[in-house]
Amino acid sequence: MPQRFIVVTGGVLSGIGKGIFSASLARILKDSGVNVNILKIDPYLNVDAGTMNPNQHGEVFVTDDGYEADLDLGHYERFLGINVSRKNNITAGQIYYSVIKREREGKYLGSTVQIVPHVTSEIKDRIKTMDGDLLVIEIGGTVGDIEGEVFLEAVRELAFEIGREKFHFVHVTYVPYLRTTNEFKTKPTQQSVQLLRRIGIHPDTIIVRTEMPIDANSLFKVSLFSGVPRNRVINLPDASNVYEVPDVLHSLNLHKLIAKELDIDINDRFNWSYPKSFELLKIGIVGKYLGTDDAYKSIIESIYLSGAQKPIVIDAQELEDMTDEQIKNYLDDFDALIIPGGFGRRGIEGKIKAIKYARENKKPILGICLGMQLMAIEFARNVGKLEGANSTEFDENTPYPVVNMMESQKEVLNLGGTMRLGAQKTQIMKGTLLSRIYDGQEVVYERHRHRYEVDAEAFPQLFKNPGEEGYKLTISARSDFVEAVELDDHPFFVGIQYHPEYKSKVGKPHPIFKWLVKAAGGKIND
């Protein structure tokens, strides 16, 4: 059980960077010699994020142990340089499911099951099972959300039971700038802190998020009306690069203040290195989730951490109505393309057209999960002349099911948590570009999230092993399934069934993205 706790709450509105702040502070303390762990609490009733729409909630992040999580766990892994697990995320759905299950099993011995104490006790018990000496707890949403109240009550009770001196509460809030009057408005933050105090939680530190640096008088007002000392009201304006945040926090010495208050010994060593200059490469993600960049968060960050500027999301549906010439005119402007994972029929034909363009014009392209499957379909249609080739996901009656549902998935009825998930052993074939990318490693463990597979056995005319002759897709990685394909005589035509984006860390992006960036810059043989 952890001995010290930092609890991060949010105020005014969501999406203001609690996850980045929590990950940054945890990284600083980790580098300072503290055995730190981190936990994300999501108040939604979903058991996990696996069935959520990426347009609404952002990407689903997959851990090594096969848990489908909120994208904040991706921030934790990238910033801390660690691999988290399902234990690092608690949802309201998990808590209520567990409590109801216990009641049905008679574990409460006939008690009237209530929010307090039964639900709060379940939350506290899960927090107590976490590893590490110091636990950073990020509570999702904002203070005042009805679904989050039970979690705030649980951490309040925990602080009372264990000892308030072992807890440090950080409230991350937002102060808007009203351009019509040229002033910052602190009233929403004041009211947010008042709500928190009514619950029984008095913040020790307030992080004031703003679009631009705030004036000292506004910070004084936040301090005065919140009852938090001025030196603990800290402004964090928007950064052009989120990887600047740990440096900024470290310079503000917040970690020293917290360590002193929690009686933690630190050595104040901080080793933080991230890309500060970027190649001006235009890399396109041919996708279908356009509502937010968060839908492809880990891919975007992997490209960024590999030293290239932020990729652009291309609407796959727009490509569907274009001719080959129009697509060429449009995509010629890009240095490389990525076909990401996804589900459903929408935009599929546009992605296939983009793959055809990249194959014929030797444009560097990376297909991830569904992207690899579509590479096989495109090759079957346009090279193998198998008219109507498809995946049974999109056409159950296709005459050429190049992509089919895995046998183990055909009897599965529920959608949540039932795919082939998490780290799976993958054998890399010698003599392939993929083998060069992995620096000769023969076995790797990569994270998966899929129900469908490329059926190479049924269509041997389309695939070959490394070193064999003929214009076919080379199978460059295997498990019980086809894990990767590539194309000879092409600078970078690589499809992978797994998701390398989930394993990129600050200072250590996944090598597949580093090589894609090299190919985009024409440096594949450097």
Curated annotation (Swiss-Prot):
ATP binds at residues 15-20, 72. It comes from the Bacteria. Keywords: ATP-binding, Glutamine amidotransferase, Ligase, Magnesium, Metal-binding, Nucleotide-binding, Pyrimidine biosynthesis. It is an enzyme of class 6 (ligase). The active site is at 369 (nucleophile), 499, 501. InterPro entries: Class_I_gatase-like, CTP_synthase, CTP_synthase_N, GATASE, GATase1_CTP_Synthase, P-loop_NTPase. Mg(2+) binds at residues 72, 138. Pathway: Pyrimidine metabolism; CTP biosynthesis via de novo pathway; CTP from UDP: step 2/2. Its EC number is 6.3.4.2. L-glutamine binds at residues 342, 370-373, 393, 451. Residues 1-264 are annotated as: Amidoligase domain. CTP binds at residues 14, 145-147, 185-190, 221. Allosterically activated by GTP, when glutamine is the substrate; GTP has no effect on the reaction when ammonia is the substrate. The allosteric effector GTP functions by stabilizing the protein conformation that binds the tetrahedral intermediate(s) formed during glutamine hydrolysis. Inhibited by the product CTP, via allosteric rather than competitive inhibition. Pfam families: CTP_synth_N, GATase. Residues 282-526 form the Glutamine amidotransferase type-1 domain. UTP binds at residues 14, 185-190, 221. Catalyzes the ATP-dependent amination of UTP to CTP with either L-glutamine or ammonia as the source of nitrogen. Regulates intracellular CTP levels through interactions with the four ribonucleotide triphosphates. CTPSs have evolved a hybrid strategy for distinguishing between UTP and CTP. The overlapping regions of the product feedback inhibitory and substrate sites recognize a common feature in both compounds, the triphosphate moiety. To differentiate isosteric substrate and product pyrimidine rings, an additional pocket far from the expected kinase/ligase catalytic site, specifically recognizes the cytosine and ribose portions of the product inhibitor. This is CTP synthase. It comes from Thermosipho africanus (strain TCF52B). The gene is pyrG.
